[in-house]
């Protein structure tokens, strides 16, 4: 059976992290890791926390999560940031869509005001 690994990336937003973590149900994944790229410590009794030296950047934090989850034997890796909340098991939906389409990476159509049409072009 395939295993699902989840990496949560957080940086100096403990309230966001707490809400994000609480929205991810334990039955949705097999392995989980939190990578904290902020200066303030994050504690989570349900998952390991890897602390960077702080300010390494989201890319490096995601690579740390991927490396950890691969070491855990995860077949599917889902990376989330601390400002994401889940009310349904989106992870299974992503995996199903991957199997049906062959697309390995899904992007959100909207990720902040700068991605609205015209704004990113300075209009």
Regions found by a protein language model. Name each.
Residues 44-54:
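Active-site regions of enzymes building and remodeling cell-envelope glycoconjugates
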Residues 35-44:
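A conserved acidic beta->alpha catalytic loop
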């Amino acid at each position: 059976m395939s295993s699902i690994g989840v990496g949560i990336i957080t940086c100096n937003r403990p309230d966001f992290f707490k809400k994000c973590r609480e929205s991810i149900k334990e039955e949705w994944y097999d392995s989980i890791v939190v990578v904290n790229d902020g200066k303030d410590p994050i504690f989570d009794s349900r998952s390991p926390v890897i602390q960077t030296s702080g300010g390494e950047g989201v890319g490096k934090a995601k690579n740390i999560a991927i490396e950890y989850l691969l070491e855990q034997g995860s077949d599917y890796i889902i990376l989330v940031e601390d400002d994401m909340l889940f009310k349904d098991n989106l992870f299974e939906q992503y995996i199903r869509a991957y199997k049906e389409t062959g697309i390995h990476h899904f992007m959100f159509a909207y990720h902040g005001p700068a991605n609205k049409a015209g704004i990113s072009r300075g209009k």
